[in-house]
Amino acid sequence: MNWTEIDTWIVIIGALCAAGCAIPGTILVLRRMSLMGDAISHTVLPGIAIAFLVTGSRDPIAMLIGAVVVGLITAFLVQAIQSIGKVEVGASMGIVFTVLFAFGLVLMRQAIDHVDIDPDCVLNGAIEFAWFDQNPDGWGIPRGAIVNGTMLLANAFFMLLFYKEFKITAFDPALAKSQGINPGFMHYMLMTMTAATAVAAFETVGSILVVAMFIVPPATAYILTDRYGVLVGLSLGLGVFAAGLGHVSAITVPTWFGFSGTTTAGAMAVAGGVLFVLAWMFSPSQGLLVRLLHNRRTRSHILAEDVLGFLWRVEERSQGSVHTNELHTALGVSGGALSKVLRRLVKHGAISREASHYILTKSGQARATSLVRVHRLWEVYLDKNFPQDSHQLHQSASRLEHVTTEEMQSHLGDADTDPHGMPVPSDE
């Protein structure tokens, strides 16, 4: 890999764009409005085209004003169609997005004859050539870095200025209103930031990367943390890392398969997606692997309690120890899962084993007694408040007994017998 100054600036510009998009993107994700970033990123196209047609140049101020105005119109139309048309927000965004984007493409075709503009550049970007677009007095800094860096600073300024307001309105607009915060103003402030950020990055990196960086880094951070401040910082870091990883991948990975390279903007978006998948799988709090392990432990815990309850009921009928096959048939679980649970219960001293037969120990007896007591109290409670047939009553209690806390048990009351006429064990 032959790294040059151009590669460094490509990564810097991509990182500035990603960080700038991640700031409003974080609020969009928290407000469950991620697709609004997608919609605005595309619907600012008419504003850009109108600015081209009116001014006859690529004046950034005119582009910014046109894009922001159309972005705010997009947000207004989405809310208006949702409330007046009584349709859900996704449908209203789809209507506004497709109509305005198509209108923008029509205008863009008209602008081609009057202004030096490439629609493919606007849609897909040309970050690989951003280094060559420099202002004469720009001290060797690409214009894309200046524009996206300025947008990042502006977004950071407004985020810090309205940090509390953005936080409260993202989670509870009603609470924000009660504290004197105007949720409508904050909403359109967010839409303005989104539209301005989109147009700042459009020509340099294209709409594909803009949309990806609005959504993917904040969504990835959302999986990794539940703290607002950490979420914002993590979104910025993930966006910057995705930009660097994407460019390195764009110039190295294709060579493994005999190709010279690929589009950097697309590779940056893919890198962000890869980071999201890794977070989705391995997040310590919400990752797929953690959930699978938690579900496995939960199933094992429930099966262990079912074994103790079954052994207790067998002893209640004075039938002595229980054979493994009898447990397997009664509980309806696989032999492997049952064997693991039995070994663990023996190891913890809850049951003892003689040949292929099992019996409760003293500690296991106490634990099983408490479990059966809760089960039968649930049957009493459900029969009194939610009458149902005896089989359904037993099944409902069998599920509830595993999740009952001491506070829940205190509301179940007391009883001598359950609806089946069986005695409720004492809690002593």
Regions found by a protein language model. Name each.
Residues 101-158:
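Transmembrane helix-bundle core of multi-pass membrane transporters
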Residues 140-212:
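Helix-loop-helix "hairpin" substructures at the membrane interface of multi-pass membrane proteins
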Residues 268-310, 402, 406-428:
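Membrane-interfacial segments at transmembrane helix termini in multi-pass membrane proteins
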Residues 17-22, 48, 52, 72-76, ...:
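Hydrophobic core segments of alpha-helical transmembrane domains in multi-pass membrane transport
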Residues 26-117, 221-240, 248-261:
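Short loop segments and helix-boundary regions at transmembrane helix junctions
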Residues 1-18:
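Membrane-interfacial amphipathic/re-entrant helices at transmembrane-helix boundaries
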Residues 11-16, 64-69, 91-95, 145-150, ...:
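Hydrophobic alpha-helical transmembrane segments
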Residues 317-428:
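Structured cytosolic domains appended to multi-pass membrane proteins
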